[in-house]
């Protein structure tokens, strides 16, 4: 997922905050890992729908049909932040890094009437970039420790 208040160790905030600090973002492996990106507000609304309208004992998967590769997301971030789309460094992949997270949220939509409100990923990403720009005091102290840990792992 993506949204405000996400720790700087996570993919999207790590890329955004690296660019804000004048550093080149890092991309694991080939960058072809795919995630179903869902805004945190939509995720929270889905959890609430399950808690208040879901049937006890049922399993509901939460997804927003937002599948996109990491390299596509990073290039979008770079573009939105006025950087060349190749202004990043490749790093070795994490051990056990999942290639794709596939989510079928059709049951959640059909049975509980939930659907995502944040369907324009670029617009949502722009808002997240703005949030991190306005809340540097929230993330800056965690950034160096996070990057030091990644450097120690060669990432």
Question: Where in the sequence are the language-model features?
Answer:
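Flexible, glycine-rich beta-alpha linker
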Residues: 1-11, 34
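C-terminal substrate-binding subdomain of Rossmann-fold SDR/epimerase-dehydratase oxidoreductases
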Residues: 13-155
């Amino acid at each position: 997922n993506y949204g405000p208040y996400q720790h700087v160790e996570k993919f999207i905030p790590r890329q955004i905050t690296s660019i804000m600090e004048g550093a080149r973002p890092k991309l694991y492996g080939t960058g072809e890992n795919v995630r179903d990106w869902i805004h945190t507000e939509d995720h929270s609304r889905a959890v609430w729908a399950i808690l208040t309208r879901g049937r006890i004992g049922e399993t509901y998967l939460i997804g927003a049909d937002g599948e996109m590769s990491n390299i596509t997301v990073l290039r979008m971030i770079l573009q939105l932040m006025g950087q060349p789309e190749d202004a990043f460094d490749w790093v070795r992949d994490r051990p056990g890094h999942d290639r794709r997270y596939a989510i079928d949220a059709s049951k959640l939509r059909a049975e509980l009437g939930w659907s995502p409100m944040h369907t324009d990923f670029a617009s949502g990403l722009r808002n997240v970039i703005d949030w991190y720009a306005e809340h540097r005091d929230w993330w800056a102290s965690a950034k160096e420790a996070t990057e030091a840990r990644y450097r120690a792992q060669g990432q």
